[in-house]
């Protein structure tokens, strides 16, 4: 597909984190009280006795409190040697990092909070893909010198070092951006290796610098791409990485740019893909040396078919959850249409299957974190527990916090809600909204709709009682009580297409408020009827059964409202937008909702 400059990537994924009590001092001094003997300090065994004797902190409410001066903070700009050569110049790439740490006595050691980012040197405006074209039919900026930033300003006074890095190919770092593959992972991992004495770092003048001030314990965090890299590095099982807090983070890049074989955009960034993402963050000197790497991204992502292949498999962290040794605190917005909710849901499930210590917050915001629910305090306690070994009760809290639509928070043992039951509803087909029984029924009608990619979803969900040629609408009876879903809705339809290619889109809609609200949605390429790995030639007019998932959600439909399902072909904001006219005929439709009993 050719490229056309119809938008820029000036803000791709880029977000910053919104972010009278007795005290106890625990410190190392040969002539004073040893940390481990402090009666008021409860330890959890996460830090060895040897390290405990080299730490100096003061606690308040079970958390580290600020005791170190920001004005005296030590700041170093260094280059850490990685084990990769992503720009293929015959030399190991070096990544640029800023290290900020408290000024301490020489025998005091501190843990590290670490964020790697491709965004520190800004983003370039690059062309993205033109999505107004036909579908493919299968045939057979440098750091500021004195600003410690939000992490540094908060955590350095509390006895933490903060390391901010520039990922390969960005800013002052060497190498080439590779959008989430092993080279990017290992480039990020190298900083943890350096903190633990397994890699080397240098000043700009070539002088080697050791991290002899560190305990070796590292916690990674970040939002969006910056939160994705912690997920990725955790799958290496690297020694020293004790915990991660991925916020609005990707767990599989395929599910960021594809859905069931369909080419899908991140919300707000139509036409974006792995190659122009890499181009946007390619802010190193001499970016032309990465030309071949970008070409390989273009080829590997296979935008033509949308199939899952080895390229995507290398960027799928979910399958490697078995290697995760760090604890994980997931934070995600239930209304995030950039990094969609499947990203947290599949990661959370995989972590649970592998007995990874975990915690999760799901908030009502979009792409980013949350400042509500006493977030900063909780983050502080989490890092203290895993990096300083403070027993502060954080792991005794319910594992999941979910923010409700009215902004209150519910605490849960797990997610999806263990009380959620997959409930199938076979829908009588009509081009008008009808009250449907919540039980199976015989169906002997069929109805058709015609694709028009220029019609936006808010138009297609409106006025469900009217016949509209470009959609089918089904509504269930008016709800007699609040009805909550928790998990992943699924759709299954039987029917045919009059062409060999189309998009398929399903919307789950809340009818009954001031205006229809799209709760969640899902997409499919019908040519992936058998698997996401392989396309199957679709015979026009032949009946097939297509089944696909919508994005996971936790949502309450209010009493007096109606649950609706809208079927359409192309989705203006997310799918490729082919010319109008494809006719789809549906003979049977069934939705499965994870209803909390």
Curated annotation (Swiss-Prot):
Recorded catalytic activity of this chain's protein: Hydrolyzes Xaa-Pro-|- bonds to release unblocked, N-terminal dipeptides from substrates including Ala-Pro-|-p-nitroanilide and (sequentially) Tyr-Pro-|-Phe-Pro-|-Gly-Pro-|-Ile
Organism superkingdom: Bacteria
Matches recorded under Gene3D superfamilies: alpha/beta hydrolase, Galactose-binding domain-like
List the keywords (alphabetical). Answer: Aminopeptidase, Hydrolase, Protease, Serine protease
Q: Catalytic positions?
A: 224 (charge relay system), 336 (charge relay system), 367 (charge relay system)
Q: Which GO terms describe its molecular function?
A: aminopeptidase activity; dipeptidyl-peptidase activity; serine-type peptidase activity
Q: For this protein, what is the EC number? A: 3.4.14.11
Q: Which GO terms describe its biological process?
A: proteolysis
Tell me the InterPro entries matching this sequence: AB_hydrolase_fold (IPR029058), CocE/Ser_esterase (IPR005674), Galactose-bd-like_sf (IPR008979), Pept_S15_Xpro (IPR008252), Xaa-Pro-like_dom (IPR000383), Xaa-Pro_dipept_C (IPR013736)
Official protein name in the record:
Putative Xaa-Pro dipeptidyl-peptidase
